[in-house]
């Protein structure tokens, strides 16, 4: 069974995540280790992120697995090898969750990204990056966005 390109099969992704986590050998060091990785494992991380962004019945389970296990971050070397360093991706998950909440509220208020950008003194590109979880926002930025969206910023 291949990876579901449309991220429709979230139970399959949960199963694959558990299988990967159970077989991973974590070396307790602060360094990355150069290893050869099956490209399907690399692709799984990409589609897992898409499945989480899509939501659904298993989105919370997928996020929990990612955050508790410290899924590997990967970068491809020129020679086709991956450097794998383990770290906790909670910040990545939080950025995506916050971004989705911003986007949902903006759409609920019928604001365009350009209008929200003008209200917050940011660029539309920055708003887009925030909504897609590709920008680590400062508290000041989040405060301005929350104010523009008529929300209260809660840092709990």
Residue ranges and their predicted role:
Residues 16, 20, 86, 106-107, ...:
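Residues within alpha-helical segments
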Residues 138-155:
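DNA major-groove recognition helix of helix-turn-helix/homeodomain DNA-binding modules
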Residues 110-128:
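Short alpha-helical DNA-recognition segment
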């Amino acid at each position: 069974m291949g990876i579901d390109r449309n991220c429709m099969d979230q139970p399959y992704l949960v199963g694959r995540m558990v299988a990967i986590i159970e077989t991973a050998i974590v070396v307790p060091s602060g360094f990355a280790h150069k290893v050869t990785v099956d490209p399907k494992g690399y692709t799984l991380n990409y589609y897992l992120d898409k499945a989480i962004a899509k939501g659904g019945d298993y989105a919370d389970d997928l996020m929990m697995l990612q955050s508790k296990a410290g899924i590997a971050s990967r970068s491809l070397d020129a020679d086709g090898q991956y450097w794998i360093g383990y770290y906790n991706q909670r910040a990545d998950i939080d950025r995506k969750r916050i971004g989705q909440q911003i986007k949902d509220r903006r759409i609920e208020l019928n604001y365009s990204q350009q209008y929200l950008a003008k209200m917050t003194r940011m660029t539309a590109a920055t708003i887009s990056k925030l909504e897609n979880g590709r920008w680590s926002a400062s508290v000041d930025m989040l405060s301005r966005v929350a104010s523009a969206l008529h929300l209260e910023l809660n840092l709990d």
